[in-house]
From Swiss-Prot:
Matches recorded under SUPFAM superfamilies: Thioesterase/thiol ester dehydrase-isomerase (SSF54637)
Source superkingdom: Bacteria
Species: Albidiferax ferrireducens (strain ATCC BAA-621 / DSM 15236 / T118) (Rhodoferax ferrireducens)
Name under which the protein is recorded: 3-hydroxyacyl-[acyl-carrier-protein] dehydratase FabZ
Compartment(s) of residence: Cytoplasm
Transmembrane stretches, start-end: none
Amino acid sequence: MNRNTMDIYKILKQLPHRYPFLLVDRVLAIDKGKSIRAVKNVTINEPFFQGHFPYRPVMPGVLMLEALAQAAALLAFDAIDTTPDEDSVYYFAGMDGVRFKRPVEPGDQLILEVELVRMKAGIFKFKARALVDNELAVEAELTCAVRKIA
């Protein structure tokens, strides 16, 4: 596999998330310290569709943002050449300019695009967006932080 991509096995080594909360299936491209393009395949089998909404399943917006944050984490860890361990955690620190533009439904492929704007002292600022069929689904500016917990 290309060094600039990640399959699910590499993703599992970088992110602590597991089913049902792992929301990145593959990294299509990563430009070290600059940007990442990843994918979340959305299926009817997602557990959140049972209640959101049974009559017309729609992916919750907060989970679209979480998928973007997970892609951002992969970009951040690659930028600083680290693999997270049990003594550190990657937190959301803020979201700005969040706009939802279209619903995401079963069968959609959510393309996650994240650009690293700046990083300093373990704080990362990103510009992020997710698309379905080249149509904007959500956009946001994300702030995340890596912190030691032990």
